Amino acid sequence: MSTGFFGDIQKVRYEGPESDNPLAFRHYNADEIVLGKRMEDHLRFAVAYWHSFAWEGGDPFGGRTFDRPWFSNEIDAAKLKADVAFEFFSLLGAPYYCFHDADVRPEGRNFAENTRYLNEIVDIFEKKQAETGMKLLWGTANLFSNRRYMAGAATNPDPDVFAFAAATVKTCIDATKRLGGENYVLWGGREGYETLLNTDLSRELDHMGRFLSLVVEYKHKIGFKGTILIEPKPQAPTKHQYDYDVATVYGFLKRYGLENEVKVNIEQGHAILAGHSFEHELALARTLGIFGSIDMNRNDYQSGWDTDQFPNNVPEMALAYYQVLLAGGFTTGGTNFDAKLRRQSLDPQDLLIGHIGGMDCCARGLKASARMLEDGALSKPLDERYAGWNGEFGKRLLSGLSLDQIAGEVEAKDINPQPKSGRQEYLENIVNRYV
């Protein structure tokens, strides 16, 4: 039954590239076959509960701009929010959603009340998933908004905060498992520091390693089959965050022996904040064997902070999904829209329009990347660039020859290499032809 929040808006349909209907897909066709698989199964879109239904439209200089009937800290308001959210999921047609515990339940007086509220909402979600066919891509715990976490959760100097956070994660993993979630995410928004003057760096890293080990142990104990994911971010809200980027996370996982247990959920905007391109982080995660899932959004390149806008840059999406396809595609992961409306976008239909545009943009990027992959448009020039390493001398350099033997061969054969063009402009033009 309709909540009435979205008025008489009908389910979003695919109408093709010529459509001028703002509430229709022009490029995202769930059943279209791309590289032998349905587009929906490639992209595995998810709606973020927090930005879509919990964010109030505030910024550092002003408070709430959105007027939503569920904006109160009451269980009945949380139930109304769930009704509206699942109505939205059904209208949009994305197959997945994601949530933090604090997005879906009221804030209780203590841990027990938080848990009771969460379980009450999970009861509702179970029924709604059965009714709608919606699935949970991942669940997580909000370990950054409440003032108890101002100095971190896993890295807090107070062991009571560590314990409260660990207990909260336990309940959220339970909820995720119960709802059939395919992943569990940890984002350490407060796991970092404002100043080293009051920070024991060694201790905090060890505590963070212990916390993550507890999560992995509990996953196996209860038989949760999903993937544990860390979401890197360099800063904000902390000055420096410990899971800075993919490379940093990999080093952390290696140090604590968790590199085979945990993968990464990579956000476009966080990659930009870390001084990387999105495809760099995806390519590195793929290379290191820890690619898991993505949070899709974009940052304003001039602002210098995390603006969480919906994606609208097709060439960027093509390069991103090219890396996803090279990784073999998603397994348990997917494309979660960690994106929010602008604070002036007040109408309920704006929420649909933002997601529609983002889904169309990703679909165009996927199709372009699939064509590039099929045609060998980028792989053939890459193979040519490194072809020398497939020869006899290249193979001996990598296995067998010592440093003095290499020096001897260079002198004996009068090896005097000349540089070759990297052909960057040619390759960039190829990408532009496909998008």
From Swiss-Prot:
InterPro entries: Xyl_isomerase-like_sf, Xylose_isom_bac, Xylose_isomerase. The gene is xylA. GO terms for biological process: D-xylose metabolic process. Mg(2+) 2 binds at residues 267, 270, 306, 308. This is Xylose isomerase. Its cofactor is Mg(2+). It catalyses: alpha-D-xylose = alpha-D-xylulofuranose. The active site is at residues 100, 103. Its EC number is 5.3.1.5. Mg(2+) 1 binds at residues 231, 267, 295, 338. It is found in: Cytoplasm.
